[in-house]
UniProtKB/Swiss-Prot annotation:
Subcellular location: Cytoplasm
GO terms of biological process kind: regulation of DNA-templated transcription; rRNA base methylation
Matching NCBIfam families: PRK10901.1, PRK14902.1, rsmB
Alphabetically ordered keywords of this record: Cytoplasm, Methyltransferase, RNA-binding, rRNA processing, S-adenosyl-L-methionine, Transferase
Active-site residues per Swiss-Prot or TrEMBL entry: C375
Any one annotated GO CC term: cytosol
Protein name listed in UniProt: Ribosomal RNA small subunit methyltransferase B
PROSITE patterns reported in the protein's UniProt record: NOL1_NOP2_SUN, SAM_MT_RSMB_NOP
Length: 429
């Protein structure tokens, strides 16, 4: 029996770690969920994701409701009030229960003397909710994005930035990839139907299925046996451009957590795949995915900027470079990105991408294919990156994806219900 814990205080502390310490929610949340009962795991996730998704609004409201911000050791209370406001605004939790549990959270964070303050702020919001929300909806904070990112989106997409922002603020659908070595998509959809769930095939990506309602993976037919993998439709699009073939030597660079490594092997089971990532910890997930799907690949820890250190002079028939990026295309899936990224990160990431591209190109065979992919929507990391690479690389040729003036294919968040993603297919002359 798991000890009863105050979920509101746990959520407040998690959000504080993201915003104040720059930690990723995907690292913070799983250990916290291990401490609570199964029925509370989903609520804890909802509170953390929801507060981070609407952080601009909650911050704006607190500034209106309080004369002075909470600082120092009392800063966690600021986030606890956010959790309370989020429940009142966005959940079906009865207001009296939301208030009571949030106020009790002050004891869990060892600030019992502030219970009255928390209660007072939340009750004041209830009284003034209508006029506060009317004022908020006329402010720039209503877009729920940091101003630096909003400016970049407005500049890059003068006609589309609002729809991008809107898509980023939605909850994402759950996409799956059917393992074609086990089942056709249609036969697996029939199994899903028998299990009482409904799925929809993607029009363009042959293995992709969108669940009508997100479900825990253990409820999916054959998940433990590798029949299906959780992967967004846009990420699955990489295989359309890579087109791996049996017998080829293929490099998956920046491979963790291994979703694309295993997709290569589903499409071309007899390919010789090398999966490389700089992050040794995340490589454990590549091993886990290969094991669950019963597949084999050569997995290496290495820096994409220095390929000779981990592959010598080896050349590959195909290279998938899923480059490190701002992840601005997957904000709906990872709302903490809005608060982890900084404007100054973008030129630094673009420089890193450029260095990896230049370093890995000599390891592509003549006539070979390199697919450059990111989950970003920013031109500096995408079309401008590839345009500059083509200009300085005489034996590189753009293929099937865009034009030399506007290279690559950019999927925007929410288009065909997928994440924001960029692909460019390059051939070595």
């Amino acid at each position: 029996m798991k000890k009863q814990r105050n979920l509101r205080s746990m959520a407040a502390q998690a959000v504080e770690q993201v915003v104040e310490q720059g930690q990723s929610l995907s690292n913070i949340l799983p250990p916290l969920q291990q401490k609570v009962s199964d029925k509370d795991k989903a609520l804890l996730q909802e509170l953390c994701f929801g507060v981070l998704r609407t952080l601009s609004q909650l911050d704006w409201l607190i500034n209106k409701l309080m004369a002075r911000p909470m600082t120092g050791k009392q800063r966690t209370v600021h986030y606890l009030i956010m959790v309370g406001l989020y429940q009142l605004l966005y959940t079906r939790i009865p207001p009296h229960a939301a208030l009571a549990e949030t106020v009790e959270g002050a004891i869990a964070i060892k600030r019992p003397q502030l219970k009255g303050l928390i209660n007072g702020v939340l009750r004041q919001f209830q009284r003034q909710q209508e006029e506060l929300l009317a004022e908020f909806n006329a402010s720039d904070a209503r877009y729920l994005h940091p101003s630096w990112l909003l400016k970049r989106l407005q500049k890059a997409y003068p006609e589309q930035w609002q729809s991008i922002v809107e898509a980023n603020n939605q909850r994402p659908p759950m996409w799956l990839r059917v393992n074609r070595t086990h089942h056709s998509r249609d036969s697996w959809l029939a199994l899903l139907d028998e299990a009482g769930m409904k799925g929809f095939p993607h029009a363009d990506y042959p293995d992709a299925v969108r669940l009508e309602t997100p479900a825990p993976v253990h409820a999916l037919p054959g998940f433990e046996d590798g029949w299906v993998t959780v992967q967004d439709a846009s990420a699955q699009g990489c295989m359309t451009w890579l087109a791996p073939q049996n017998g080829e030597h293929i490099l998956d660079l920046c491979a963790a957590p291994g979703g694309k490594t295993t997709h290569i092997l589903e499409v071309a089971p007899e390919a010789q795949v090398v999966a490389v990532d700089i992050d040794e910890q995340r490589l454990s997930r590549v091993y886990d995915n290969l094991k669950r799907l019963g597949m084999k690949a050569t997995v290496k820890q290495g820096d994409g900027r220095y390929p000779s250190q981990w592959c010598g002079e080896q050349q590959f028939d195909r290279i998938l470079l899923d480059a490190p990026c701002s992840a601005t295309g997957v904000i709906r899936r990872h709302p903490d990105i809005k608060w982890l990224r900084r404007d100054r990160d973008i030129p630094e990431l673009a420089q890193l991408q450029s260095e990896i591209l230049d370093a890995i190109w000599p390891h592509l065979k003549s006539g070979g294919t390199l697919v450059y992919a990111t989950c970003s929507v920013l031109p500096e990391e995408n079309s401008l990156q590839i345009k500059a690479f083509l200009q300085r690389t005489a034996d590189a040729e753009l293929c099937e994806t865009g034009t030399p003036e506007q290279p690559g294919k950019q999927n925007l968040p929410g288009a065909e219900e997928g994440d924001g993603f960029f692909y460019a297919k390059l051939i070595k002359k």
